[in-house]
């Protein structure tokens, strides 16, 4: 999933094992999660029993909500979703969303309500018009909002980031409110809850934040709000702590799998980032029923990391081509094609895919066939990039993205997530749609590729790497690397607009399909914005501690 592979001499003997790379720092976590000990069964049972009582109490509150009290209803739904509780109330929330969308009888002069309603509906797949904000524009080009009405200002800023191309009113809302919020932040107490909200939004608008991480960060802020619902607050804390127990057990399982993979395959040159990869994938599939998706995703990401490091830095051209030939056979008899150092890994990879089939059972094991197809396509594209490299070919930006938007692993990741979902709405048609690499997933792949390349290119330019999208853009337009990176950041911003437009146009697919792609985009943005946190993972340490180490005090 990094940039196309560096050139390696083809004269190395097949039996030579690549040496460990000094480029990548060792794991920051060691055996930490391998030694995890869960609470006793009675303790966990008590937590689950209390959570169930609270869930039903909150359900009654939600069922009692109507559009007659629109501000309260909108705020309640936003709060539940932001606290990571929306999954439990999908039916009730869907019913209310339809009523909110259909009911135009509300105070259109209330900027906070208009902003929150717009944000809520667009976030949940309703294509509401942005012209509701036109009445708030001033002759000076700003937006009418009293200086003391800071909450409305923040709501408008966050709502505007659910924008589509050509929505000038939202462009103007972002530029206008950003300046006012930056000024406001300088006058707030730094540790106040509202200052933290403003600061977080200026760094990452609410729509783009990783859901489970946002829940962890928002719970202590919600606790300070005078209008908080005590049952909602207690449930949010308990729910997060229960999820954390599941996450730690999954991390223990994935860490053991990874350690066995590296020990038996003897591939010591690969990046040891299984904890960070689990954190990354967790951000896309954090709801309680998606445990198997998280495990499959993490293992697939681990396998891709190994294959990528083989192709990217350590394998000869001949070795990589042999691996590609064996890969598509999915059979132990193909190991005779491989150099010695790849053979054990190949067998372990086959065993891993068999474990996926076993975990899915007879009714859903067919999903692994689609996952294999996605992985075959990934390796096929890796070989195309090798040919470009060996021929010293620099593609145009458009030509590069036709390959690299897919070779970044977009299809492999989405198919991995869908494979592990218990939801029976995920069908063969869902996988066939995904494997056709439709424009929505292609846009997501371009987003991941560009985000990766902007942060990895400067690090990789000192090595013998094939041109990234940054280099392609530099050559095509005759500009510097810094200027190319700035332009690509604009393209990344456009990708958010593209994905929103394309998601709103999707028909006939389970709603989890676009939701998953957006969650992948959020967690990828968190990994690559301003740094390559997978390679230099110190940047993730505090976030990993928050999600997997530190429970929320009850």
From Swiss-Prot:
The allele found in cv. B73 encodes an inactive enzyme while the two alleles found in cv. Delprim encode an active (TPS5A) and an inactive (TPS5B) enzyme. It is found in: Cytoplasm. Keywords: Cytoplasm, Magnesium, Manganese, Metal-binding. Pfam families: Terpene_synth, Terpene_synth_C. The lineage of its organism: Eukaryota, Viridiplantae, Streptophyta, Embryophyta, Tracheophyta. Changing residue 163 to R: Restore 60% of the activity found in cv. Delprim, ableit with an increased production of (E)-beta-farnesene. Full activity. SUPFAM superfamilies: Terpenoid cyclases/Protein prenyltransferases, Terpenoid synthases. Changing residue 455 to V: Restore 4% of the activity found in cv. Delprim, but with the same blend of products. Full activity. It comes from Zea mays (Maize). Binds 3 Mg(2+) or Mn(2+) ions per subunit. The Asp-Asp-Xaa-Xaa-Asp/Glu (DDXXD/E) motif is important for the catalytic activity, presumably through binding to Mg(2+). Mg(2+) 2 binds at residues 308, 312. It comes from the Eukaryota. Non-functional sesquiterpene synthase having less than 1% of the activity found in cv. Delprim. One of its GO terms (cellular component) is cytoplasm. Mg(2+) 3 binds at residues 452, 456, 460. This is Inactive sesquithujene synthase. Its cofactor is Mg(2+); Mn(2+). InterPro entries: Isoprenoid_synthase_dom_sf, Terpene_cyclase-like_1_C, Terpene_cyclase_plant_C1, Terpene_synth_N, Terpene_synth_N_sf, Terpene_synthase-like, Terpene_synthase_metal-bd, Terpenoid_cyclase/PrenylTrfase. Belongs to the terpene synthase family. CDD domains: Terpene_cyclase_plant_C1 (cd00684). One of its GO terms (biological process) is diterpenoid biosynthetic process.
